[in-house]
Amino acid sequence: MSGQSLTDRITAAQHSVTGSAVSKTVCKATTHEIMGPKKKHLDYLIQCTNEMNVNIPQLADSLFERTTNSSWVVVFKSLITTHHLMVYGNERFIQYLASRNTLFNLSNFLDKSGLQGYDMSTFIRRYSRYLNEKAVSYRQVAFDFTKVKRGADGVMRTMNTEKLLKTVPIIQNQMDALLDFNVNSNELTNGVINAAFMLLFKDAIRLFAAYNEGIINLLEKYFDMKKNQCKEGLDIYKKFLTRMTRISEFLKVAEQVGIDRGDIPDLSQAPSSLLDALEQHLASLEGKKIKDSTAASRATTLSNAVSSLASTGLSLTKVDEREKQAALEEEQARLKALKEQRLKELAKKPHTSLTTAASPVSTSAGGIMTAPAIDIFSTPSSSNSTSKLPNDLLDLQQPTFHPSVHPMSTASQVASTWGDPFSATVDAVDDAIPSLNPFLTKSSGDVHLSISSDVSTFTTRTPTHEMFVGFTPSPVAQPHPSAGLNVDFESVFGNKSTNVIVDSGGFDELGGLLKPTVASQNQNLPVAKLPPSKLVSDDLDSSLANLVGNLGIGNGTTKNDVNWSQPGEKKLTGGSNWQPKVAPTTAWNAATMAPPVMAYPATTPTGMIGYGIPPQMGSVPVMTQPTLIYSQPVMRPPNPFGPVSGAQIQFM
């Protein structure tokens, strides 16, 4: 069972909802479980510090927030996580910590929840002090002593005297804070403090290696220093001897808790004669009496001390290199294990062969395709056999003759059957379009049908300018004339044809409009009756008659008898014999019109009175209606064949 508390799970869930993966991982790494932070969480946070799009201050603030918890486990694990990121994370993290004024304010931390809380609170206060000192050291020298280059050409070995005397005390302060942790093997009783001790142990080795190289550089330059510098140098060396004793005790504790002996360096102390030589040199600079000593003896003592310190530094370096090598071997072992696991997974999968049998899907598909596919876009081959036109598919027409046409595709024949103008040539289409004008008269016998199978003669001209588009050119019976109005335009215009032969070969130049339809005697289809309320039918005569009757010309009064031979009584609506009447200039004796419904003022502009009305004369008085209630705007009538609807002017 996991040792995570309910509070840890709730906190992690809250960060999951907010979408902060970094904060969630911080909570996972600092749970109430009494064990060190898990490696997967630490590795994730380390990778986050290497990503440029990760907010480092937010990560640090999340860790600082966890240190405010009352549980010693959460606080201790927060410090361990921070220390781990400072050592193995990107340098940006420690740079941010060094730029902060305050870090961990845990000098008064105390967990009173239990006896173990009291004991661990002491180490938490010491541990937080070391981390604060580590950040301060980076702020002062702008680099981490545990990561500097070491060796003969290292940072501490090549540093000048002035900078060296300022840098070594900083290392001493950080070393003091580390050694103040002062833990015994009996106190390393849980996984949390053990994880902290391992980080401190690695820091102690690297920090003491830098410290040792700084002392070697100091001893090499000691006899060439000024009096004040020699005094500072002697004080630094004495402190170094004290720290060496304490670091030896720290390493003994590490050996007791089970750390490998090969990972613990051997510390070789310098001979005691070196300290006497340094003191005598300082006394000589101060003018005091000293024992007689030759330069050769001083050089021998100095060389022995440097060699012993160099061996210590070499041991520390070997430990560090051994640690790096162990880390590399661990990574290689993990990579090898992953490769072996991958190979096992691939070996378990069956090998697929390229020469496999046909799939059942393709086999079934081959069985279904019993008929060859038809390409509707391909050009059909010519055939000598004459196929019957498909116009009698629904038995709509009974052709009386079959025109001699070129063999065409089925789609073209169907289109020609229903009067598709695209199936004809350009000349035929151009010849058919003017016939759609109701003012032009042309005998149906003059139309020559010309059908070509050449696709290149296709024209984009479409009969969109027809007056009544979209009506089905199906044969219908001659509609009965209305009882109110009996108009025969064909007899009036003089171009009525009695013998009209309908071309059933598949082409109708007018689409069934503007021509009377003659039903064949062989047709057995039921006659489609036009509903009485239909305003527009397939025949122009009945359509115009219905429109004129529904418009209610003449104040809505229905005229039962219309005599077209009385031009003086009515106006002609059109035709080839229609002539506009010119009003006489001597007298205004017009026919009596309907009673006026409105009056026009004398200031009405010319041409605004009505359609087809002459302009108002200034000398003719206009009779107005005294009972006028409102003025109605005059609009142009939508029917050009009828009289103007609305108000009329009556002249006296």
Curated annotation (Swiss-Prot):
The gene is PICALM. One of its GO terms (molecular function) is low-density lipoprotein particle receptor binding. SMART domains: ENTH. Signal peptide: none annotated. It is linked to A chromosomal aberration involving PICALM is found in diffuse histiocytic lymphomas. Translocation t(10;11)(p13;q14) with MLLT10. Its main location: membrane. Binds to clathrin; involves primarily the C-terminal sequences, but the full-length protein is required for full binding capacity. Binds phosphatidylinositol 4,5- bisphosphate. Interacts with PIMREG; this interaction may change the subcellular location into the nucleus. Interacts with AP2A1 (via its alpha-appendage domain). Interacts (via N-terminus) with VAMP2; VAMP3; VAMP7 and VAMP8 (Via N-terminus). Interacts with LC3/MAP1LC3A. There is a cross-link at K238 (Glycyl lysine isopeptide (Lys-Gly) (interchain with G-Cter in SUMO2)). The modification Phosphoserine is found at S16, S20, S303, S315. This is Phosphatidylinositol-binding clathrin assembly protein. It is found in: Cell membrane; Membrane, Clathrin-coated pit; Golgi apparatus; Cytoplasmic vesicle, Clathrin-coated vesicle. Keywords: Acetylation, Cell membrane, Chromosomal rearrangement, Coated pit, Cytoplasmic vesicle, Endocytosis, Golgi apparatus, Isopeptide bond, Membrane, Nucleus, Phosphoprotein, Proto-oncogene, Ubl conjugation. InterPro entries: ANTH_dom, ANTH_dom_sf, AP180-like, ENTH, ENTH_VHS. It holds the Pfam family ANTH. Expressed in all tissues examined. Residues 14-145 form the ENTH domain. Belongs to the PICALM/SNAP91 family. GO terms for biological process: amyloid-beta clearance by transcytosis; axonogenesis; clathrin coat assembly; clathrin-dependent endocytosis; dendrite morphogenesis; endocytosis; endosomal transport; hemopoiesis. Residues 221-294 are annotated as: Interaction with PIMREG. PANTHER family: CLATHRIN ASSEMBLY PROTEIN, PHOSPHATIDYLINOSITOL-BINDING CLATHRIN ASSEMBLY PROTEIN. Residues 559-580 are annotated as: Disordered. The record marks Q648, I649 as: Breakpoint for translocation to form CALM/MLLT10 fusion protein. The keyword Ubl conjugation applies. PROSITE patterns: ENTH.
